[in-house]
Amino acid sequence: MKYDLIIIGSGSVGAAAGYYATRAGLNVLMTDAHMPPHQHGSHHGDTRLIRHAYGEGEKYVPLVLRAQTLWDELSRHNEDDPIFVRSGVINLGPADSAFLANVAHSAEQWQLNVEKLDAQGIMARWPEIRVPDNYIGLFETDSGFLRSELAIKTWIQLAKEAGCAQLFNCPVTAIRHDDDGVTIETADGEYQAKKAIVCAGTWVKDLLPELPVQPVRKVFAWYQADGRYSVKNKFPAFTGELPNGDQYYGFPAENDALKIGKHNGGQVIHSADERVPFAEVVSDGSEAFPFLRNVLPGIGCCLYGAACTYDNSPDEDFIIDTLPDHDNTLFITGLSGHGFKFASVLGEIAADFAQDKKSDFDLTPFRLSRFQ
């Protein structure tokens, strides 16, 4: 059988692409080296932030607004356990923070619902938070967080119900191109398609070694917290910048545990074996202490944590492009630790590519050629 589309990597973007392409009527094969959702990539750990007024640059705002529409649609398939939780997101940092300036600019340009608070206003609304006098907060009331593993599980199930073929626990070892399309090699044999999408995450260079992607080991952890920090108490998800420039992110507490991670830093790695489990690097359990001590002093000890990986591009912007000389193969990579919120729209973009549809978005800033 020759498929319309083969998807290599069915984590966040791949799961979405499989669903949207199958829903569009294409004959699709989803593949993954493991059984998604799984612990080997960048989507585990239950939750991911979604922010609309984007501190990483306003070029992302049209994408994230479409992503939100698609997340809302997907959430309707899980109304008892919603995939998107509109908790709001408070962005904290010094008044002269470049990241917060970008958030404010994005909000102004796209007329987003963002409220600016000074230090006293932040602490009056959320007494659990402590910030210096020179800090401000930009509160995105319509943002929140996503259930990442539940989202992937839902997409995969919906795609399967729609007739999508799925080949999991079976790594793709090679990709070949010829006049008839794309062939992938696996332990289960060879499969052919008219087009392919490569969204293999951290280890995309195993298949496409020419891509400028650097895997980085990252950790996040859950700390002891009480009901004051919960969604029920209107405690928001958050990003926070310390005076030294370190960037943190976190979520409202659930089951007396608050999840937090440090966005910058981490350990550069070159193989999956180097992504050692949480606590095998001495700093893992204490990485969030500077933020917790200064901003959330009521949070208790570290309960447990997990390691994941970022697939970093040189400028930490996404890479979305077709292979040079092979315009029937699209790759989506270099998501650099801020990609999950876009998984829905990136999957839709991939499905449009498979249907020969022109994208509704300007993807020029994400082309591979910017590094050449």
Curated annotation (Swiss-Prot):
Cofactor(s) of this protein: FAD
Gene Ontology MF: a single term: flavin adenine dinucleotide binding
Sorted UniProt keywords: FAD, Flavoprotein, Oxidoreductase
Top-level lineage group: Bacteria
Any matching Pfam family: DAO
UniProt enzyme class: oxidoreductase
Positions bearing S-8alpha-FAD cysteine: C308
Cofactor, how bound (note): Binds 1 FAD per subunit.
Catalytic reactions on record: N(alpha)-methyl-L-tryptophan + O2 + H2O = L-tryptophan + formaldehyde + H2O2
A GO CC term assigned to this protein in UniProt: cytosol
This protein's record includes keyword Iron-sulfur: no
Binding site for FAD: 4-34
Enzyme Commission code: 1.5.3.-
Function text: Catalyzes the oxidative demethylation of N-methyl-L-tryptophan.
Subunit and partners: Monomer.
Family: Belongs to the MSOX/MTOX family. MTOX subfamily.
Protein known as: N-methyl-L-tryptophan oxidase
